[in-house]
């Protein structure tokens, strides 16, 4: 059994090495940067189309992006393996280093000789006519300064800031909780993106096919500056579930959280255009995007003759218009404002009555979010406690001399300056 523990201890030491943890953190940060640079969760065909002619960073084609699981970095097997590896490294580091350090800080160490004190990081001696009284005065000064003191005949031990040793343990615990929450959310979470036009609904079903929640878009508005640039867009939603109903408004950076589901205002689009051609009634026709013409170009193709000949292309960039009409040769025929007058197109009067925008909603269900928040809270508390310096001090009174030694895990120079001043204060008080 003893011979078998050697390799296990070496393996545990390697896993808990700080350098390994730093490398893993860098790899996770790099993977997160890749996940930010490459759109996540899109259909596979979109990666093939996007990176077939222009590889990502000049290196990866669409097929390679899919093979390396870069289309879903945060739920990929290799990313979760990195999180598990780092979590194991932090747990082993806490077990092998931080926990023993905390136990050592809580344990009183009894130094009995001045020679032992002289070997400490800080050691000072001061002549003291009455060493017993000097030791008592030192104890009084230390207790007044918030030190814990253990007094024994002709010697004492004191400590302050032992709670700082809890900080690294809490930091490691917070990181592990954070990674567990992230992994749980990646494996058990759901994400859905949909465009809804006002009056339309979206049903969220449970595993049995029963409606869990119905989201209806009552109104959608886009706020623009005087130049027509988008400033904000907001959606008035109605949520209906079993025995409950809720009205709420969401906007960019102001999501709605309800029963474990978060609804974000993510995007906007143009859904339909209401047209009147000649003497026809007002027709509500769907619009579609044309990415080959630009990032935000919507339009539709309309025939102008009963047999479908002489088509025209109508395009828009916003719900405010104008709608620009082109013929098959790309020549501009007319510009129509929503709600404005009609214009003649191919011998027919054409009028745009209205353009209906659609709200882009992002729905996320992430069961790991509470664990992530808890991890961040524990991490912040641990980080704050880690800043607390842990100081230990020993004093021995012998042969007319008061000898003091100390250890400190942080800001040793300040402690080295403070110790002689502490001794001098004891001597002055004794002389007084």
Swiss-Prot record:
The chain crosses the membrane at residues 18-38, 76-96, 166-186. It comes from the Bacteria. It is found in: Cellular thylakoid membrane. Its main location: membrane. InterPro entries: Cyt_c_bgen_Ccs1/CcsB/ResB, ResB-like_domain. Keywords: Cytochrome c-type biogenesis, Membrane, Thylakoid, Transmembrane, Transmembrane helix. It is a multi-pass membrane protein. GO terms for cellular component: plasma membrane-derived thylakoid membrane. Belongs to the Ccs1/CcsB family. This is Cytochrome c biogenesis protein CcsB.
